[in-house]
Regions:
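Structural beta-alpha unit
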Residues: 11, 77-107
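General small-molecule cofactor/ligand-binding pocket signal
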Residues: 28-30, 85-89, 139-141
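Short, flexible loop segments at boundaries between secondary-structure elements
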Residues: 131-144
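A short acidic, glycine-rich active-site loop
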Residues: 51-71, 116, 120
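Active-site phosphate/pyrophosphate- and oxyanion-stabilizing loops and adjacent acidic/basic residues
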Residues: 17, 74, 95, 128
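Glycine-rich, Arg-bearing micro-motifs that act as flexible, cationic patches
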Residues: 109-133
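Small/aliphatic-rich secondary-structure junction motif
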Residues: 1-55
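Short secondary-structure boundary segments
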Residues: 31-32, 106, 110-112, 143
Length: 144
C-alpha cells in the first residue's frame, strides 16, 4: 500500500522526516496548490473587457504555483533519500489531500496551527478537515 506524505509549504520537512520510518512502503509525496488565488486573478482580469488574453495574470500565477510545487517536491524527494513518487495537484487543498489518500495505507501530515498548546487549535482549518475526513489512518506530526 501507499503512504501519502502531505508536502505543505511550512511543515514539509517534519513530514518527510517522519516518512523515512516507512521506507518499505511505496511513498507518495503530495503537494496541493490552492486554486483560489489564480482563480481570483483570472476573474478580475475577465472583468476588464478588451484585455488581451496573453496578459491574464491568472496564467502567470498558475505557472508560478506549478514551478513552486515542482521545486518543493524535488527538495522533499532529496530530503527523503529513498525512491518515491510525487504528485502536484491544484484545487481545494483539503479536498485534494483527502482524495489522494483515499486508497492509502497511511497519510502523514503535520500540525500547522497554534502549536504552543495541544488540542484542536494546533490544527489549521485545512488540516482539521483532512484529519476529520481521511478514510485511512493518519500520522499527525508535531513540527520541530
Amino acid at each position: 500500500m501507499t503512504v501519502v506524505v502531505w508536502v505543505a509549504d511550512d511543515t514539509w520537512q517534519d513530514c518527510v522526516d517522519a516518512a523515512r520510518a516507512f521506507g518499505g512502503e511505496e511513498l507518495l509525496l503530495l503537494h496541493v496548490s490552492d486554486h483560489d488565488v489564480p482563480g481570483a486573478a483570472h476573474g478580475a482580469f475577465a472583468g476588464l473587457f478588451g484585455r488581451h488574453p496573453s496578459r491574464d495574470p491568472g496564467a502567470r500565477l498558475d505557472g508560478l504555483a506549478a514551478d513552486h510545487a515542482s521545486r518543493l517536491l524535488e527538495a522533499a524527494a532529496d530530503r527523503l533519500g529513498v525512491p518515491c513518487t510525487t504528485s502536484a495537484r491544484v484545487g481545494r487543498v483539503e479536498h485534494e489531500v483527502v482524495a489522494a489518500a483515499r486508497e492509502a495505507s497511511l497519510l502523514i501530515l503535520c500540525r500547522d496551527g497554534d502549536v504552543s498548546h495541544a488540542g484542536p487549535r494546533s490544527l489549521g482549518p485545512a488540516t482539521r478537515f483532512v484529519v476529520d475526513h481521511a478514510t485511512c489512518p493518519v500520522l499527525l506530526v508535531w513540527p520541530t
